[in-house]
């Protein structure tokens, strides 16, 4: 199997939107479509010539969900998010869209749970709940790709940094515990694709991410 990963960065806070395509089947998954639905659709249809089969959300902040409904409706696919994020997804104040003069909410989605396995692109996607940035934040881990494992970490784990916890439902204690106990125990060659800025590896984060050390104090 050959996979093609495409990143498109958009929106007021430069959110990374990911497309993972199985080049053999032509299917793709779109993660965190946070802005510019028309461009996301164009990338999938014209640039990648792919057929999206799902929209996955790592959490419910507006900069990760703003284009989700339009993209999902256009392709006739479902949105997936952690059940624990339901309240935040449906509340413009909590998901911060109201702070930018918008009222964005998502009430229709397929709820997933910690440890659940999803089957897309002939791959096993493991849902890893990582509350902290928000109460219903999660990551998606693909252990068997034919190459290095992949982790889509949302705003939980960044390159040598980690997500803010001063927004509604945030908790630094939970965030650090989740990073150390669930993410940094993954294989060191795992490629990490975060919600903002550049990619990294678990090996790098075990060495240089402050969360690797702060978590031991919580």
Predicted regions and their residues:
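Active-site HxH/HxHxD metal-binding segment of metal-dependent hydrolases
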Residues: 28, 35-124, 148-149, 207-217
């Amino acid at each position: 199997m050959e996979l093609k990963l495409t990143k498109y960065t958009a929106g007021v806070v430069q959110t990374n939107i990911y497309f993972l395509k199985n080049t053999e089947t032509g299917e793709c998954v779109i993660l965190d479509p946070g802005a510019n639905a028309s461009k996301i659709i164009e990338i999938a249809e014209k640039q990648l010539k792919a057929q999206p089969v799902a929209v996955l959300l790592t959490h419910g902040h507006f900069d990760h969900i703003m284009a989700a409904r339009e993209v999902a409706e256009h392709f006739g696919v479902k949105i997936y998010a952690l059940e624990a994020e339901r309240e935040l997804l449906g509340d413009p104040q909590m998901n911060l869209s109201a702070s930018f003069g918008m009222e964005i909410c998502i009430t229709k989605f397929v709820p997933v749970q910690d440890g659940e396995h999803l089957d897309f692109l002939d791959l096993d996607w493991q849902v890893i709940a990582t509350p902290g940035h928000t109460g219903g934040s999660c990551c998606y881990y693909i252990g068997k790709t034919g190459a290095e494992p992949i982790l889509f970490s949302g705003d939980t784990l960044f390159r040598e940094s980690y997500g803010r916890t001063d927004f509604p439902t945030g908790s630094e204690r939970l965030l650090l515990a989740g990073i150390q106990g669930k993410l940094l125990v993954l294989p060191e060659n795992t490629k990490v694709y975060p919600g903002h800025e550049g990619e990294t590896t678990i090996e790098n984060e075990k060495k240089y991410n402050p969360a690797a050390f702060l978590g031991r104090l919580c």
